[in-house]
Regions:
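N-terminal intrinsically disordered, cationic/polar leader segments
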Residues: 1-73, 77-130
Length: 130
């Protein structure tokens, strides 16, 4: 099944996607795309421990990710007013400007979960066929 939904000004992008996934009981899916804008961004850059926080207008250039049982793992790319692009892990606190349009595709033949991997130090994706 495919899902398309729209968020409006002030909504938290990450939290609202997670709420949508929980409401629709989605267990395995991909975030195919999103378009829209933010007025506040919280992202974790590659290999960084801290979250980058910026309060300024951004266009959502890309949003992709995997959705597993009880968890979304998403990466976002944002362009500022000069066209400079930053990207990283989508964190709580990314607040929608005028709109954000989200497209999710459910993966009917899979169950996706995450388990801690001692090698990487992160919860990594576990893929099981139904």
């Amino acid at each position: 099944m495919n899902y398309v939904f729209r968020l409006t000004k002030g909504q938290d992008l990450r939290n609202e996607i997670q709420n949508f996934v929980n409401t629709h009981n989605i267990k395995a899916a991909i975030v195919k795309c999103a378009v829209g804008c933010l007025y506040e961004a919280h992202i974790r850059l590659a290999s960084a421990e801290n979250t980058l926080h910026k309060k300024e207008p951004f266009e959502i250039v890309s949003l992709i990710g995997t959705i597993s049982v009880n968890e979304c793992h998403m990466h976002i790319s944002l362009a500022d007013k000069n066209g400079a692009v930053i990207g990283g892990h989508l964190k709580e606190g990314c607040l929608v400007g005028s709109t954000a349009e989200i497209c999710i595709e459910e993966l009917d033949n899979y169950i996706l979960t995450r388990e801690f991997d001692e090698t990487t130090g992160y919860k990594e994706l576990i893929i099981k066929e139904k």
